[in-house]
């Protein structure tokens, strides 16, 4: 088309288009009227655009031809230069070779002249070597020239490809231009149509009668305009018809062939979400894996290190376990290691069944009346005392409770001890707590010395004790074993000296030593909260010397030793190995059994204590969440279970533990004891408020409520109980639980009547004439009708008469008329059994 356009052609070409149509319209009178409508369209085409396009295309072709010519010239030039260089190099080498040949020929000629043409083999060899060198040099020059020519050709090819891409882009621009010009023409046609429609719509009444046809036309034209505008815009930015970009503009990323397995660093505790984040997987994947392992978890649940390691290894990751207590190890490891060890006194724990005379024996040894001070003569917590012998030797005694509730306290006593003295009553023999004490001693690896107590009683039988202990692998020396049996009487003091000698002999065999001058370490035997002095801990020093002013790290607590007292309440400035002391100055009440260690830096001690608290909280939370999930379905199936809420306050930590454990063991399937709060020290207003909120009873063990707490307790009518003996506490809690049990109902037969005759009454139906053979027949009690000792009806009486009078009851041996409600099939020989439902109280 562009080639046919001549140079003298007009710049613009206008085309007129005229069409005539007839439109019939209805007038107001109902007659149809025909109107002649002439439509004129004018289109102008600019011819110079085609000329510009032709000129542009010609310029592009010329530029392309020029580039191709330049490329060929460059290739030819590079080839000629390479050939020229190779020829020049070859000529140079040839001239050099000829020159060398001429030089070598001169002496050869003179030699021939002088020696009658003698041929030298060395010269022949040199000639061959020179020829070889020349050939190699020519080969290298030729290869170099070929390489240069190849590079020049590649570069020319790259330029040609770049030119081709430029030509393609210019042709795309040209097609875009054609496309846009086509859209411009369509837009002009649309504008003409819109002007015609505007001219037609002058008569508004007629437009209204058409029912909105023009509105639809205008809507359609508007949609078309928007569509055209969008298409034009998309064409400009290289998009397709549906608005999506072409594939040439899209970036594609290849999916990795396999998942990258990273190293996972796991601390002591971690949540499921954190573990998923570290492994770059979804949390649901971890939950699925743990469900396969039999564990139900949530996304925010804390799991321990071992579980997290199993999950990570299951998913194919390498696990790095991180030890979070590095600071703790560093602080505890900073000790005096080169200090000299010396012989120390033995720590002896006296264990045995309740009321077998442990405290009385220790009392006689200490020469002080302690047993009278204990409530009911029962030891409620560990007492620690040290006794000095006549020869200057010292023994430290720990007195543990014998009651079943104090198992954990006995276990602590056995762990802190060197020798266990097992007290067995000669008249009572081996009892449950005796067996338990033997097990604790074996678990702690402490040797036993058996004290057979109460030998002064007439019914005492020490031989029976030895026989019974044989069944529990406690073999006396008499039977070839290594356990010393010493008969004693705590009341009269018989055999006590022999017992002390046996203890010292056993300690010499053990060769007990400890560092005396280093930093102290020990174990908390007992702890409590004193109202005036604050937290008090009874610490048994095991190595080193504990001095006043030392910084002590004790479980979750820390502090400076402000004051120390011995078992008699006397102030002391230091305590060496095997000496028990009461320590004041800790930040809180430590748990009995915690290790007490002297450290150098108070700041680091605080950091370690806070770290331990946080770790304990996380582990406790993880355990609670696990228990909640595990018990969820069982709790749903159990339904409502009665709960007895209790708040426990005691004088020492060990007693709190023992009472809470004993109360939890009292729980049954119907009534559960829930300890909502426990602590060491007096009963405060906070405890009373908690009891009000949780509807709990407050149990005080060797403690009392202060004035503010008493006011709240009286105002809210809270049940407050004080105890000093654990037997009474447990029995009363059992009674309270029994009151919460659902009552049982029992049926008791109170009377029996035999049917002798049956009368028919028009109003009451069948009336049984009966003789009361047993008990009393009562009018308002339920009855059963028996025939041949088989119950055939159960209901109630409608009437009970004696002669013509209505009566409430008829006694044994009397006749009466009985009408059974809703039952008329009474026969002679039947028995009418009268019973009552009695409530039976249950107990635990």
From Swiss-Prot:
Please provide one cellular component term from the Gene Ontology annotations of this protein.
cytosol
Spell out the Basic residues composition-biased ranges. Answer: 200-210
Map out region (G3) in residue numbers: 399-402
Keywords assigned by UniProt?
Cytoplasm, GTP-binding, Initiation factor, Nucleotide-binding, Protein biosynthesis
Q: Quote the biased-composition stretches of kind Acidic residues, using this chain's numbering.
A: 162-175
**Basic and acidic residues compositional bias: what residue ranges?**
1-11, 79-161, 211-237
Low complexity composition bias: which ranges?
21-30
* Record region (Disordered): 1-48, 79-249
PANTHER family annotated for this entry? TR-TYPE G DOMAIN-CONTAINING PROTEIN, TRANSLATION INITIATION FACTOR IF-2-RELATED
The UniProt entry's sequence similarity note says:
Belongs to the TRAFAC class translation factor GTPase superfamily. Classic translation factor GTPase family. IF-2 subfamily.
Q: Return the protein name.
A: Translation initiation factor IF-2
Q: Which organism is it from?
A: Haemophilus influenzae (strain 86-028NP)
The root-end lineage is: Bacteria, Pseudomonadati, Pseudomonadota, Gammaproteobacteria, Pasteurellales
- Which gene codes for it? infB
């Amino acid at each position: 088309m562009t080639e046919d356009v001549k140079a003298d052609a007009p710049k613009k070409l206008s085309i007129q288009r005229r069409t005539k149509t007839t439109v019939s319209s209805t007038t107001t009178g109902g007659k149809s009227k025909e109107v002649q409508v002439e439509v004129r369209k004018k289109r102008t085409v600019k011819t110079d655009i085609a000329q510009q396009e032709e000129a542009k295309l010609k310029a592009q072709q010329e530029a392309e031809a020029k580039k191709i010519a330049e490329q060929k010239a460059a290739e030819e030039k590079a080839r000629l230069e390479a050939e020229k260089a190779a020829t020049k190099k070859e000529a140079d080498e040839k001239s050099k070779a000829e020159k060398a040949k001429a030089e070598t020929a001169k002496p050869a000629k003179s030699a021939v002249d002088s020696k009658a043409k003698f041929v030298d083999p060395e010269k022949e060899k040199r000639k061959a070597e020179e020829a070889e060198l020349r050939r190699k040099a020519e080969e290298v020059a030729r290869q170099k020239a070929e390489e240069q020519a190849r590079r020049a050709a590649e570069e020319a090819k790259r330029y040609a490809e770049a030119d081709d891409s430029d030509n393609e882009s210019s042709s795309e621009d040209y097609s875009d231009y054609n496309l846009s010009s086509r859209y411009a023409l369509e837009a002009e046609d649309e504008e003409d149509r819109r002007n015609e429609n505007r001219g037609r719509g002058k008569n508004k009444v007629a437009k209204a009668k058409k029912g909105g046809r023009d509105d639809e036309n205008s809507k359609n034209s508007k949609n078309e305009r928007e569509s055209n505008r969008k298409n034009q815009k998309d064409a400009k930015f290289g998009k397709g018809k549906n608005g999506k970009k072409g594939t040439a503009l899209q970036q594609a990323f290849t999916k990795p062939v396999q998942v990258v397995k990273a190293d996972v660093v796991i601390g002591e505790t971690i949540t499921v979400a954190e573990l998923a984040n570290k492994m770059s997987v979804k949390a649901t994947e971890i939950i699925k894996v743990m469900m396969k392992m039999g564990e139900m978890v949530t996304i925010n649940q804390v799991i321990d290190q071992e579980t997290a390691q199993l999950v990570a290894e299951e998913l194919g990751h390498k696990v790095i376990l991180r030890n979070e207590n590095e600071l703790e190890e560093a602080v505890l490891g900073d000790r005096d290691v080169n200090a000299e060890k010396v012989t120390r006194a033995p720590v002896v724990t006296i264990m045995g069944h309740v009321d077998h005379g442990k405290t009385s024996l220790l009392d006689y040894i200490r020469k002080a009346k302690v047993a009278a001070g204990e409530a009911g003569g029962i030891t409620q917590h560990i007492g620690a005392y040290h006794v000095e012998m006549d020869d200057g030797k010292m023994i430290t005694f720990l007195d543990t409770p014998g009651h079943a509730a104090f198992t954990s306290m006995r276990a602590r006593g056995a762990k802190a001890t060197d020798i266990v003295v097992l007290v067995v009553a000669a008249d009572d023999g081996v009892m449950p707590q005796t067996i338990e004490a033997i097990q604790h001693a074996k678990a702690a690896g402490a040797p036993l010395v058996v004290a057979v107590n109460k030998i002064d009683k007439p019914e005492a039988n020490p031989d029976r004790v030895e026989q019974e202990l044989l069944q529990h692998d406690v073999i006396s020396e008499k039977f070839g074993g290594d356990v010393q049996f010493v008969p004693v009487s705590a009341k009269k003091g018989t055999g006590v000296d022999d017992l002390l000698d046996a203890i010292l002999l056993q300690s010499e065999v053990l060769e007990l030593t400890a560092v005396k001058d280093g930093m102290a370490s020990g174990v908390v035997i007992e702890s409590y909260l004193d109202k005036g002095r604050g937290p008090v801990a009874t610490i048994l020093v095991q190595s080193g010397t504990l001095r006043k002013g030392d910084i002590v790290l004790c479980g979750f607590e820390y502090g400076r030793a402000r004051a120390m007292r011995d078992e008699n309440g006397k102030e002391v400035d230091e305590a060496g190995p095997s000496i028990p002391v009461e320590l004041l100055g800790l930040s809180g009440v430590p748990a009995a059994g915690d290790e007490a260690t002297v450290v150098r830096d108070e700041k680091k001690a605080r950091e370690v204590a806070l770290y331990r608290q946080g770790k304990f909280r996380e582990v406790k939370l993880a355990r609670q969440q696990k228990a909640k999930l595990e018990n969820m379905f069982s709790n749903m199936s159990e339904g409502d279970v009665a709960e007895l809420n209790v708040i426990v306050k005691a004088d020492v930590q060990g007693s709190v533990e023992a009472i809470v454990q004993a109360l939890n063991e009292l729980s049954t399937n119907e009534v559960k004891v829930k300890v909502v709060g426990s602590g060491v020290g007096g009963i405060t207003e906070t405890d009373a408020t908690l009891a009000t909120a949780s509807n709990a009873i407050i149990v005080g063990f060797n403690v009392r409520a202060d004035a503010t707490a008493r006011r709240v307790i009286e105002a809210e009518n809270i049940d407050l109980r004080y105890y000093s003996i654990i037997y009474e506490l447990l029995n009363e809690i059992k009674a309270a639980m029994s009151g919460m049990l659902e009552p049982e109902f029992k049926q008791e037969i109170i009377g029996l009547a035999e049917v002798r005759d049956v009368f028919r009454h028009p109003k009451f139906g069948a009336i049984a004439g009966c003789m009361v053979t047993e008990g009393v027949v009562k009018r308002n009690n339920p009855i059963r009708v028996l025939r041949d000792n088989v119950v055939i009806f159960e209901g109630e009486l409608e009437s009970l008469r004696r002669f013509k009078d209505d009566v409430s009851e008829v006694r044994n041996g009397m006749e009466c008329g009985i009408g059974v409600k809703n039952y008329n099939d009474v026969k002679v020989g039947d028995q009418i059994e009268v019973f009552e439902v009695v409530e039976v109280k249950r107990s635990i």
